[in-house]
């Protein structure tokens, strides 16, 4: 995997994987939709990986989902990615925008503070007072910039925006036009070919500001589910923890048995069923793969910088509390039950599980 050297904490995908994108562009002989930097096949290779071209896999899970998303973005409807928190909706959105437009930074972060100007345009008020309405005083939104350049705009957490803000999306997606009456009669921006919108919404938050039927019709909905394959999830966690640890001046990896503890704990508590079929009480907290990465990373940092020894299941147990004890006091009871039954039984056969069980009991 080629990663651009930079001291920034987080690079956008088009910079982080700049070398991979360059290789894909160089060898891309397939037909491209108007305005696309890569062909649909090359976009797929960028996201799902291509060993022959030394392109790393970046999205783990439902490969046909990626194909459907690419097809949607070639059409006239927007793409709406919905799912539980931590299922890589934003990651998939960023990767699609980086591959298709070469720019994943045209983003509006949905919240109660978003107003219609964030989707259309605003003004530099000093220039507005000095010169009156002019192109120099106008501040384009990320969506307007995407329309002008024929690029992908991203809207995160759309359902957190107020209904009147969501309604502004209807004309943008149907007419692909933004009127600018302040600049004169008939002044407008029409979207260049290649423009489209990727929005995301959490299933747990859909009731915050429910989308209207008219807006829903402008989007093609795709559900991003948690990773079904345990081996895929384990590979993803190991890879992302490795990328994070590359920021530190030390070489450290989670031992295989400790990584297995992380994956099993999260899958058991997420699904409500252990690997042997035993029923497990599910906490209300989101036991997502993203949280599993955070726990694994925290365990490795704890072992490397505080304990000064090899990571064990005990380090995992200490980091797990911050994930489970978030939304409901009853989640503590559910975790105790899991530790007293599932973890205890596994601890008789595994040192990593024994260490996890002991540390979890000590912290109780």
Regions found by a protein language model. Name each.
Residues 42, 142, 232, 236, ...:
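Exposed alpha-helical structural elements
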Residues 2-248, 253:
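AAA+ P-loop NTPase catalytic core and its hallmark functional loops
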Residues 304-364:
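C-terminal engagement/docking regions of AAA+ P-loop ATPases
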Residues 27, 243, 272, 345, ...:
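Surface-exposed polar/charged interaction patches
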Residues 234, 241-311:
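Conserved AAA+ ATPase small/helical "lid" subdomain
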Residues 67, 141, 163, 167, ...:
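Non-catalytic, well-ordered alpha-helical scaffold segments
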